[in-house]
């Protein structure tokens, strides 16, 4: 009996050690995303008129509570750090599992970028916070392809991020923005850090066509919105870099009966 108890205790200690080592070694700045996902799913079902999805350009740049105070509609910011287009599409689909918004905002900073047949990174990793459903399985299949080792790394981060032992720093122990803070701000995560920025003239930006992989995801978003009678607004947040897809997004929006808003150039408001 003592041997059995000893074996069980050892197994428990090893299991707990692996779990917490994996937590310590997970990529920096992903804990916020886990809290953001938990916060969103703690909200009452069907309680928001407007939901925004996208990268840090939205979750750090769109104060939805101020929108509510000014205009009276309920809104939630379901953006997270980094986010290539297929990650944003996953969050969009996940949002509709519990909410029935009238308007969806999709931020388009990374509209040309899609994770396909790639190794695990921090962005893909934090989607672990989203529970299993068809859209998530499709997302992981697109990200990982047929490589089973990538799935193993996804579920056991100790295997994927063991090299982080040499990069453990303050942020490895940081608890991030709390679930309660996200709940109070309805997903918005602002900052009091101000950096003077010069916005370039958009008329000088090279314009490119959208990749086929991006168009397929945009079509998916449009079709889901049409089926659910949701008004769809794509928008691009002004920033100091060069954005090459404002013309393509304006054309796409016009062709698909939705809206594209580019605050830098109001000629792209359709």
Question: Each PLM stretch: what is its role?
Answer:
Residues 267-270:
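Conserved small/polar residues in nucleotide/adenosyl-binding loops
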Residues 121-228:
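Secreted/periplasmic serine-hydrolase-like ester/acetyl group-modifying domain
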Residues 82-86, 211, 238-245:
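Acidic-and-aromatic substrate-binding clefts and catalytic sites of carbohydrate-active enzymes
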Residues 26-41:
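Alpha-helical transmembrane signal-anchor/signal-peptide segments
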Residues 41-66:
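Short extracytoplasmic
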Residues 6-23:
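Hydrophobic membrane-insertion alpha-helices, especially the h-region
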Residues 233-263:
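Substrate-gating cap/lid alpha-helix
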């Amino acid at each position: 009996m003592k041997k059995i108890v000893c074996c069980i205790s050892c197994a428990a200690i090893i299991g707990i050690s692996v779990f917490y080592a994996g937590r310590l070694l997970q990529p920096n700045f992903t804990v916020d995303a886990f809290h953001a996902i938990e916060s969103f799913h703690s909200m009452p079902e069907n309680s928001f008129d407007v939901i925004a999805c996208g990268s840090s350009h939205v979750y750090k740049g769109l104060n939805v509570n101020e929108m509510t105070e000014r205009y009276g509609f309920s809104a939630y910011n379901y953006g997270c750090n980094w986010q290539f287009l297929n990650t944003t599409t996953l969050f969009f689909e996940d949002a509709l599992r519990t909410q029935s918004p009238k308007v969806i905002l999709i931020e388009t900073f990374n509209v040309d970028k899609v994770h396909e047949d790639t190794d695990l990174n921090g962005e893909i990793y934090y989607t672990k916070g989203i529970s299993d459903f068809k859209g998530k399985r499709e997302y992981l299949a697109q990200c990982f392809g047929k490589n089973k080792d990538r799935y193993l790394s996804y579920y056991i981060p100790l295997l994927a991020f063991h090299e982080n032992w040499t990069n453990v720093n303050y942020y490895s122990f940081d608890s991030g923005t709390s679930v309660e803070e996200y709940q109070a701000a309805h997903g918005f995560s602002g900052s009091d850090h101000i950096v003077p920025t010069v916005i370039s003239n958009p008329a000088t930006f090279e314009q490119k066509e959208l990749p086929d992989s991006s168009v397929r995801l945009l079509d998916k978003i449009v079709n889901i919105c049409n089926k659910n009678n949701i008004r769809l607004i794509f928008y691009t947040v002004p920033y100091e870099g060069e954005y090459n897809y404002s013309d393509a997004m304006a054309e796409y929006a016009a062709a698909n009966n939705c809206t594209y808003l580019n605050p830098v150039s109001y000629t792209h408001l359709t």
